[in-house]
Amino acid sequence: MNNPKIPARLPALLLAVLLLAGCATAPVNHVAADAPRAVPLQPLVKPRPVIGLVLGAGGSRGFAHVGVLKALESAGIEPDIVVGVSSGAVVAAMHAAGLRAAEIEASALRLEDSDLLDFTVFGPGRIEGGRLQNYVNEAVRNRPLEALAKPLAVIAAERETSRMTVFTRGNTGLAVRASASVPRLFWPVKIHGTEYVDGGVASRVPAAVARQMGADIVIAVDVSWRGSADAAAADVVIRPQTVRSRITDFSHKLANLAAGEDAAREALPQLQVLLAGAAANRPPVRPRPGAAG
């Protein structure tokens, strides 16, 4: 017997809502010409030792990366190439775009979780990720990876295989969004038919990538709870004593930023010795054939 209180069209309306929700649960396949892509890495060559900075995964603990940049900049140490994964990719993109540590710090202190996290009801995760993409693209003035002031590698992982992908070309914000898409929390990011998730799935601190990009001295910043074995490929590993909290908890950003600055300052003597030794032992760079002399 039909319930007279239920409109006859309600089941059809519910079905329509579910169908529309189903359409919204599939990640968009990004196939535009500016979609992020991986190309063979070209080592950077300079007449002095090349410094690589690797900023690791760690959610909101990634605010410590900003403190590390402050300490390095104060000491006159300027990275030549940058590698970022997950929250580290956000800071790495801003640094590679030419922002100074004070500018990144000011942006971080203004940041609210709602600026980055767009929660959804339907979908393969609780957070869609578009706000994060837009935030990064605005910070880098909508420049693609290859047009930033410094070489930048953004690390993501293929969802099906967990294999590492190193994005060095294309839309910076979209690459960072893929790198930070924590499985089951964020929607995966689909690029040219392949779904990508948080780069920390493949490597939380991919120090070896900086070597492949030509770094003579690799500085790795590990903000993960358990530490990352991949950081061992670095010459100097900075491990800030961050506050343990949910990866989306921004309430400890001041403490984490200070922890990053303190840890980097402690590492400065070791780093300065390494830089001096590398400069003394570096062979001269030979001019390329045909180059004007």
Residue map of PLM features:
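Long, contiguous secondary-structure blocks with strong helical propensity
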Residues: A89-A93
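Hydrophobic helical h-region of N-terminal Sec-dependent signal peptides
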Residues: P11-L20
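Patatin-like phospholipase
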Residues: N2-I6, L19-V82, M94-G293
